Amino acid sequence: MRYHQDPTTQQPTILLVDDEEFLRRLLARVLGGAGFDVIEAENGAAALRAVAGLDGALRLVVTDIHMPVMNGIEFAREFRPHHPTVPVLFITGRDPGITDDPADFDGHLLRKPFRSETFLAEVGRLLGDGSESLGRDHSVA
């Protein structure tokens, strides 16, 4: 888990959860370049530990679905009751067939591969802050 936060800034904080380190770091760079503070976690269990002390600072979660230890769906089921206003964006390169309940995704599912501009547009849409205009036309996953 890595923290990119600068305690002197008021940038939106995003939790990024993915077991693929290369992709996680690449997406963290994309988000950081767009002005977001990023907290990284390698699986759902690590993500739950990471958010334990954030107290309202977290604005969005981006999580892979298929991960060891605790997958993204299990993480979201544990996370949402404690943070009901924080949206969760699921990303996956495979069939998300882990769940039969479409409510698990809330319509926030982005399939890999995607471009950084598509990713940032979805982040901005979920944050509702106009961030969808950020980003460049680069493939990231």
Kindly give the residue locations of the regions a language model identified.
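Acidic, metal-coordinating helix/loop segments flanking the phosphotransfer/catalytic sites
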Residues: 40-60
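A Lys-centered signature of the CheY-like receiver
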Residues: 112
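Active-site residues of response regulator receiver
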Residues: 64, 92
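Conserved phosphoryl-transfer motifs of two-component systems
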Residues: 107-109
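Non-catalytic signal-transmission and effector/linker regions of two-component phosphorelay proteins
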Residues: 1-15, 21, 25-28, 52, ...
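Negatively charged, flexible loop motifs adjacent to catalytic sites
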Residues: 94-98
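Acidic catalytic/metal-coordinating carboxylates
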Residues: 42-46, 70-75
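Receiver (REC) domain active-site loop signature in two-component systems and cognate sites
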Residues: 67
